[in-house]
Amino acid sequence: MGQKVHPYSLRVKINKDWKSKWYFDKKLYSTILHEDFLIRLEIMKFLKGIKFDISDIEIIRNNPQKVTVVIVTPRPGSVIGLKGSNLEKIGQLLTKKISKKISIKIKEVKRPELDAQIIANGIAKQVENRVSYRKVLKSSLSTSMLKGAQGLKIKIAGRLGGAEIARSFEVKEGRVPLHTLRANIDYGFSEAQTTYGIIGVKVWLFKGEVLGRQTNSDAGQVINKKPFRERGESVKNFDKILNNREKANERQSRAALNKKDGLSKDETGLLNKLGSSFSKERIDSNEQNIGG
């Protein structure tokens, strides 16, 4: 099921938040939903020249007659325009469409290499410019992994390279656990308009796992304090298994130190019982002192 459903909708209120935040009477639901659709459509039409720089559009309504629109982008200057001209025009356009007061805010993406939508947009833009899709996918994959992604999967489909029969091509690196609900997976989709038709680009980006109960203040925060439970390990015995692993690692490190110092088996056994890390030279010096 995780392979088919949208990763964002599957994790809403687990480690993702709603993109449209409002609550009204059910009689107004269809009207408000259609307004949200029009807002996103008109903004993308107006900013079609820089549509590949838009990561997301969030809509917040605390008042039936006031709408707050948050445009998420890695390049705020191109969206704002000269002295805020673009924001002013967008506000006037949306006010005519839905006849409500519009407030527009800009939210900057600090790390675009770890934003799935920006990655998908970048790939689509380069494919439109006739860059080799294999080269583009491998370049995007390596860049995101170097910037700290724990896993990335990119799938591109359509008439690749002008082929007569449409096909898909996929690259993957690291872990992308789509079935794990606590996994913080970012998803992006974009389309490239080519002379051969539309080529679709999908990106799944794994940022880590969210453990424990989340609050509004730390929603989406990645916590990696403990190693994760492996398949086949029960939750009941997980702490016991962790303790056993720590003891085993301690024994291995102690054995490596003893081997480096050149201690015999008897000396190693004695040191393990005492829980000490004396070197062979110190033991020899003690024996000489006792003999003298």
From Swiss-Prot:
InterPro entries: KH_dom (IPR004087), KH_dom-like_a/b (IPR015946), KH_dom_type_2 (IPR004044), KH_sf_prok-type (IPR009019), Ribosomal_S3_C_sf (IPR036419), Ribosomal_uS3_bac-typ (IPR005704), Ribosomal_uS3_C (IPR001351), Ribosomal_uS3_CS (IPR018280). GO terms for biological process: translation. Residues 247-268 are annotated as: Disordered. One of its GO terms (cellular component) is cytosolic small ribosomal subunit. GO terms for molecular function: mRNA binding; rRNA binding; structural constituent of ribosome. Residues 39-110 form the KH type-2 domain. PROSITE patterns: KH_TYPE_2 (PS50823), RIBOSOMAL_S3 (PS00548). Keywords: Ribonucleoprotein, Ribosomal protein, RNA-binding, rRNA-binding. It comes from the Bacteria. Pfam families: KH_2 (PF07650), Ribosomal_S3_C (PF00189). Binds the lower part of the 30S subunit head. Binds mRNA in the 70S ribosome, positioning it for translation. Part of the 30S ribosomal subunit. Forms a tight complex with proteins S10 and S14. PANTHER family: 30S/40S RIBOSOMAL PROTEIN S3 (PTHR11760), SMALL RIBOSOMAL SUBUNIT PROTEIN US3C (PTHR11760:SF19). NCBIfam families: rpsC_bact. Belongs to the universal ribosomal protein uS3 family. This is Small ribosomal subunit protein uS3. It comes from Borrelia garinii subsp. bavariensis (strain ATCC BAA-2496 / DSM 23469 / PBi) (Borreliella bavariensis). The lineage of its organism: Bacteria, Pseudomonadati, Spirochaetota, Spirochaetia, Spirochaetales.
